[in-house]
């Protein structure tokens, strides 16, 4: 059995660790609220862009944008969104497992893959497995910069438009609620019919799917023309979805970190209680031994 001094040192060490995890829990809780606000802030914008784009395409059926055209898949692009830091439970492990499974599936189907990494953890994974990296962006901070994100993803979008890849996927963690985050592997391009939102999940949706009516009795006046407007809207819509993928991951990261740090703090409290019990028993045993020695010495006299 360890001595009293050793136990006291262990208790002090665990107490110090608990202070750190408790502080990290509080910081993560604060960042989580801000991340959730940013995640939800883009929903009204995405809703309106989708509704207008759906209206334009319905009113101009003769024009088919490349983002909407299905084609034989021979090569794909994958955007992997992870965190820059750890200490967020199994968040990165779960999305990495899903991504590796999909990459293996593409390999079995002889489909070429080129990847973009957002976050140090994803970059490390793709580097280890020898994936073809065409762009990367790390150290995004707590508030993602749209220009940096679009700069990294532009090469994938250009390759899609020029036919070098036939589909674009994003692997990210979808925020469901504070206690639940879901790893998802979603196809962004080509866009699905009706411009469905790939981040829909029960009541936690980016926005409701726009209802496309076939009996429009009115239309917009387009400047300079409908084709240019559709091109710009769909480009912005796809960019918005990619931004949303990063925002969802950041909200999930802070939620997972808060839960992980709370669990660590609770476990530390339990360990302190167990160590305190051992300390008390050891101390009591030492006192009892000393009393026995005194009594034994007195009896001998």
From Swiss-Prot:
GO terms for biological process: proton motive force-driven plasma membrane ATP synthesis. GO terms for cellular component: plasma membrane; proton-transporting ATP synthase complex. Keywords: ATP synthesis, Cell inner membrane, Cell membrane, CF(1), Hydrogen ion transport, Ion transport, Membrane, Transport. The keyword Ligase does not apply. Transmembrane segments: none annotated. SUPFAM superfamilies: ATP synthase (F1-ATPase), gamma subunit. GO terms for molecular function: ATP binding; proton-transporting ATP synthase activity, rotational mechanism. Pfam families: ATP-synt. InterPro entries: ATP_synth_F1_ATPase_gsu, ATP_synth_F1_gsu, ATP_synth_F1_gsu_CS. It comes from the Bacteria. It is a peripheral membrane protein. The keyword Cell inner membrane applies. It is found in: Cell inner membrane. F-type ATPases have 2 components, CF(1) - the catalytic core - and CF(0) - the membrane proton channel. CF(1) has five subunits: alpha(3), beta(3), gamma(1), delta(1), epsilon(1). CF(0) has three main subunits: a, b and c. NCBIfam families: ATPsyn_F1gamma, PRK05621.1-1. Produces ATP from ADP in the presence of a proton gradient across the membrane. The gamma chain is believed to be important in regulating ATPase activity and the flow of protons through the CF(0) complex. Belongs to the ATPase gamma chain family. This is ATP synthase gamma chain. It comes from Bordetella pertussis (strain Tohama I / ATCC BAA-589 / NCTC 13251).
